[in-house]
């Protein structure tokens, strides 16, 4: 039952997301950070799917109870069993919450929405992913999915572009709150020179060779291969910058194209630069890479409100991103706290890289301004307050 004690100080919220720590997804990372920031005011629990059968079905992480339903995407019977377990898990967890908060669009949305309505729980939906969390894409999933998508009591959007697309479909009466992703600016912070040197050595990087960093899944939308081609365009110099990729390259996540990393490795070997191209699998200590690198590049063709870009900026790392209306251009002011380049323009990326690598003073100043932007607009405390306001809004309505 929902809490009826007026003296109760904590709102009980069930977060429903596609992946959660130690597995990695942008929504899951954001859920964990906000749950930590709201500790003492909001009692969060999590229902999530997992592709790792070694993880516990239920465990407590950072004081948050996490319920997992394991799914083998390659086996139809596994999907059927997982669906049944998910409904059971959702029913048990939702009975003990005041608000149900769905993150993103997936097959979990329909049963979650039905159960929330049956139990009389207000429903919040956050739009996280460009393309996937948009009305046109959800319509293709069928009438039930679209009805669930449009029926949330309150919709939150991480980016202006996602908010506008939802509003176009729902009409002006539907409230859609802009709630940008937030960053733990204590965890993601610049490293002093001595600490940075220690970090580089711990990662196996040379002390002085410049490092260009990519962080993200190896999906076609992320364009890791475009960055490789741009990196190869850099003019010859006494020291070739190292290109470091941090992100999942293999099966397990539906977004990943396994051929991308293979092609990059093959092309790097063929041109004799394989030693300067490094692949690191996903890590829950990604801040070590941001704090040790020289330049970050986000070459994506599609993003909503990219966490990796915010994390890089919070670490004072000069960053280059493709100009995506209502997404990256809502974060970066070109030439001030980062660089924006056209989508799919490897020459433009190479040119921006050349400038930042050549003028380290200007790059450093850009990194300082980038951190100031994150501190002012995207600290996790600001996101947490917006989520809390959303919970109070739907509870007051109900």
Model-derived regions: residue spans:
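An aromatic- and histidine-rich active-site surface loop
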Residues: 54, 83-85, 99-119, 125-127
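Carbohydrate-associated surface elements
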Residues: 50, 161, 182
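Conserved acidic donor-binding segment of nucleotide-sugar-dependent glycosyltransferases
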Residues: 333-335, 339-346, 355-361
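A short, histidine- and acid-enriched strand-loop-helix "catalytic/donor-clamping" loop
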Residues: 20-24, 74, 107, 123-139, ...
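Short hydrophobic beta-strand element within catalytic cores of glycosyltransferases
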Residues: 318-322, 332
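Conserved donor-binding/catalytic core segment of Leloir-type glycosyltransferases
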Residues: 14, 206-222, 228-231, 243-246
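Aromatic "clamp/platform" in nucleotide-sugar-dependent glycosyltransferases that forms part
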Residues: 282, 301
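A short, well-ordered alpha-helix in the C-terminal region of glycosyltransferases
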Residues: 355, 362-377, 383-389
